[in-house]
Amino acid sequence: MFKGLFICSLIAVICANALPQPEASADEDMDEREVRGIGKFLHSAGKFGKAFVGEIMKSKRDAEAVGPEAFADEDLDEREVRGIGKFLHSAKKFGKAFVGEIMNSKRDAEAVGPEAFADEDLDEREVRGIGKFLHSAKKFGKAFVGEIMNSKRDAEAVGPEAFADEDLDEREVRGIGKFLHSAKKFGKAFVGEIMNSKRDAEAVGPEAFADEDFDEREVRGIGKFLHSAKKFGKAFVGEIMNSKRDAEAVGPEAFADEDLDEREVRGIGKFLHSAKKFGKAFVGEIMNSKRDAEAVDDRRWVE
């Protein structure tokens, strides 16, 4: 359990410390303001990630938390709900800051491009916002994998002691790369569903967000996100923990060299779980923003 905690904490520390430097983004032609925005995002992500790990991993049921059965009926007990609630509260706060930093930027109309979301009927402003998020995620993923795979940079990025107990070999590095690559593809796929939906008003239910004053349309969008995230989470955890299903979902060659043990599975599962919850709050904040009046051209969004 403690090693699983170490893995999650390591990810949080890397999120907080590895990327904020302007020079890390030099090749991306980013201005100072954008670099500061990404730096603030990663710093906040590190803080709330640590808090979430602390709340969830202190419980006695960690070993079963990420098993396939944990996602079956979402039968979370009161203690788990309290931990998730605290996490979502933190996620909401840093989500607001992230939206402010990224959505107010002057650039990145080409980061994804309107044509990438043509079928979703998104206007240019929405595409820029989504593009910024995906672009940042892509850069973060590349840099994170780079830090792990290049031992010469470890001392500057995190410190050699952070990796001492883990002793990651090439096999483990490939596993981290696969996870980040899958997460990026998943994010791109479900963005369209969130932003251009006509259904799922019952997926979460208006009452779940009553205090946030979400209208029906916002609830539908959030419902789609949660539905997609739940399916993704089930499949990902199931594939990692059950080697018998690998051949159908990805192909045995994808995981053949990984040979993940139980400790690694718990760490990956916890990271995925926190990412899912952060995404839930982040999308909620984007869709409940005062700036959305222009983005979706709907008077119901105007105060």
UniProtKB/Swiss-Prot annotation:
Antimicrobial peptides that inhibit the growth of numerous species of bacteria and fungi and induce osmotic lysis of protozoa. Rapidly inactivates channel catfish herpesvirus (ED(50)=48 uM) over a wide temperature range. Magainins are membrane lytic agents. Keywords: Amphibian defense peptide, Antibiotic, Antimicrobial, Antiviral protein, Cleavage on pair of basic residues, Cytolysis, Fungicide, Hemolysis, Immunity, Innate immunity, Repeat, Secreted, Signal. GO terms for cellular component: extraorganismal space. Residues 19-26, 33-36, 62-72, 79-82, 108-118, 125-128, 154-164, 171-174, 200-210, 217-220, 246-256, 263-266, 292-303 form a propeptide. The keyword tRNA-binding does not apply. Belongs to the gastrin/cholecystokinin family. Magainin subfamily. This is Magainins. Residues 1-18 form the signal peptide. Synthesized in the stomach and stored in a novel granular multinucleated cell in the gastric mucosa. It is stored as active, processed peptides in large granules within the granular gland secretions of the skin. GO terms for biological process: antimicrobial peptide biosynthetic process; defense response to bacterium; defense response to fungus; innate immune response; killing of cells of another organism; regulation of defense response to virus. It comes from Xenopus laevis. It is found in: Secreted. Its main location: secreted.
